């Protein structure tokens, strides 16, 4: 696999403390605020007119929760990310035509949110392991483009 045993345990130890529902909504919300061009994929989500509107939007929270539950699932199959995300890759790439660059942006936002939530616990080695994971997931999601 692309993660060492040590990195896997760092990732899993922190993940066991993550409130997936809350962090998912915050990560997706921040993506839409920080990178406003990503909003075009979410036009059916209602009010995205301001940071407050986005962060309080129920549909954004619900989709963020779905996104992070999938990510959680990916962590359980860390050595087969391509297989785990094949269906979602097809949906996002073929049907929704999401630019794969956006998966990288969301991964980086997720890392920021984790750093924000966990503070000192989010040590440089933990961050390094998570950067590898989000890059791996983004890569797996972009797989259908190649």
UniProtKB/Swiss-Prot annotation:
Keyword Iron among UniProt keywords: yes
Disulfide pairings: none
Superkingdom of source: Eukaryota
Alphabetical UniProt keywords: Acetylation, Heme, Iron, Metal-binding, Oxygen transport, Phosphoprotein, S-nitrosylation, Transport
Gene Ontology BP annotations: hydrogen peroxide catabolic process
Modification sites for Phosphoserine: 44
Family to which this protein belongs: Belongs to the globin family.
Protein name per the record: Hemoglobin subunit beta
Protein source organism: Proteles cristata (Aardwolf)
Lineage: Eukaryota, Metazoa, Chordata, Craniata, Vertebrata
Gene name, Swiss-Prot/TrEMBL: HBB
